[in-house]
A protein has these predicted regions:
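Membrane-embedded alpha-helical bundles of multi-pass transporters/translocases
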Residues: 2-423
């Protein structure tokens, strides 16, 4: 039996630990900082809407640039590991710094226009800097998957596990960061939305997440050899479009951008219809908590189920067919959520409609989770395809396409939200 050059169990666990930590940090910002900007320092809605939109669109452009840099990297540690070793500390510092800002509401009440401008400017600068530093770690984190094993089976398995672990790390922070921050404020004898509790919570969670993230760099080994060829940034950008299979993945991902907006709308339904604009309201009323648990639980469980079964489905069917199946599932589930709302706009809190919506949230979760796994596997296949046909492995630039799709979709979604907020 032929020996395959692949990762050990310990190495797999170290990588997954890093993935867990990275997603903790990501959601400190996408959930915690977003709430902090909106409800704690009270940035104008239009300001933080445009900040998030512009930063994410810039990130989408910046990602391929970073991917090109990764592909040109040649060190004794490999192509991706240097960034995984050194980027967590930088991300940690910038993440914490983003929370150290003034209070816009207080500055406005005092008529201090200079402070108001400074607060908005620092919010924008720190968020853009965070996005750029996060990219330095994110592209190599996904790119190294195709470099630590030569086994297609092990790679697909690791991608699936990575998506599951990432969702767990994300979910842990999503459901806890605001509640922990407000609990700390109560312990400090402050208002629940005071800055101190959020800053302390951000520091604690970010340091823990960064320490775990470090494991992805220190605990892995790149096995797939580098070729001698390198490409300029211009050539790398051209390669993204020239490779037909990868081009199709990019186009498909961009065409799915409206589904990200639909996800935001679904979460808005959860936040404003059931929780009066504040998810922490669910912790004050048992019936609302149960409703949120059913709906959010359906979403997360759906993701975990699809991520777990995706490798088996891709073994039996073509990956693109599985991808299309999950894409269609999420689209249909979103449409049906809207139909249910039209049928019973004032009765969605009744148990029958809660169960129906819970099932539909489960369907959307399955769709999103399955698509994410299939997309990562197809990108890995494209790297092998390019190496087979042209002798060049574009690990960084191709996996930057995954981040490009995610951030471009999020940016377009945030842009639409910001536009609606100006109406």
């Amino acid at each position: 039996m032929e020996n395959v050059n692949t990762y050990s169990k310990k190495e797999r666990n170290m990588f997954l630990t890093g993935m867990f930590g990275q997603n903790m940090i990501y959601n400190v910002v996408t959930v915690g900082l977003y709430y902090y900007f909106q409800n704690v320092i009270c940035l104008p809605a239009i300001a933080f809407g445009w900040i998030f939109a512009i930063a994410r669109i810039w990130d989408a452009i910046n990602d391929p640039m970073m991917g090109s840099i990764v592909d040109k990297t040649r060190t004794k540690w490999g192509k991706c590991r240097p960034y995984l070793i050194f980027s967590p500390i930088v991300i940690c510092v910038i993440t914490i710094a983003a929370f150290f800002n003034g209070n816009y509401a207080n500055a406005k009440a005092n008529g201090n226009k200079t402070a108001m401008i400074f607060i908005v400017a620092w919010a924008a600068i720190s968020y853009v800097l965070w996005g750029m530093s996060y990219t330095v770690g994110d592209i190599p984190l996904w790119g190294i998957i195709s470099r630590i094993t030569e086994s297609e089976k092990d790679r697909s398995s690791l991608i699936s596990l990575s998506r599951i672990i990432a969702s767990i790390g994300a979910g842990l922070v999503v459901i806890s960061i605001v509640a922990v921050s407000q609990s700390l404020n109560s312990a400090f004898g402050l208002d629940t939305n005071a800055q101190k509790g959020f800053i302390v919570a951000a520091i604690i969670i970010t340091i823990i997440g960064s320490a775990l993230f470090e494991c992805a760099g220190t605990g892995t080994k790149e096995r797939v050899p580098n070729g001698s060829e390198t490409k300029t940034m211009k050539e790398s950008f051209a390669l993204m479009w020239k490779c037909k299979p990868f081009r199709r993945i990019l186009i498909s991902g961009l065409l799915r951008a409206p589904l990200q907006l639909m996800m935001n709308i679904a979460m808005t339904l959860l936040t404003y219809y059931y929780c009066k604009g504040n998810l922490t309201y669910a912790f004050t009323k048992l019936d609302i908590f149960i409703i949120v648990l059913i709906l959010a639980g359906g979403l997360f469980i759906g993701q975990f189920v699809s991520m777990a079964i995706s490798p088996a489905l891709m073994k039996k069917y073509e990956t693109k067919k599985v991808y299309n199946l999950f894409s269609g599932l999420s689209a249909v589930a979103f449409v049906l959520l809207f139909v249910v709302y039209l049928i019973a706009p004032t009765d969605l809190s009744k148990i029958g409609f809660v169960v129906i919506d819970g099932i539909l949230f489960f369907g959307t979760g399955m769709g999103f989770g399955g698509v994410n796994v299939c997309q990562s596997v197809m990108i890995s296949d494209c790297i092998d395809y390019e190496e087979y046909h042209n002798g060049y492995r574009p690990d960084g630039i191709f996996f930057s396409g995954q981040s490009f799709i995610t951030k471009f979709s999020a940016g377009i979604s945030s842009l639409f939200q910001a536009m609606f907020l100006t109406q």
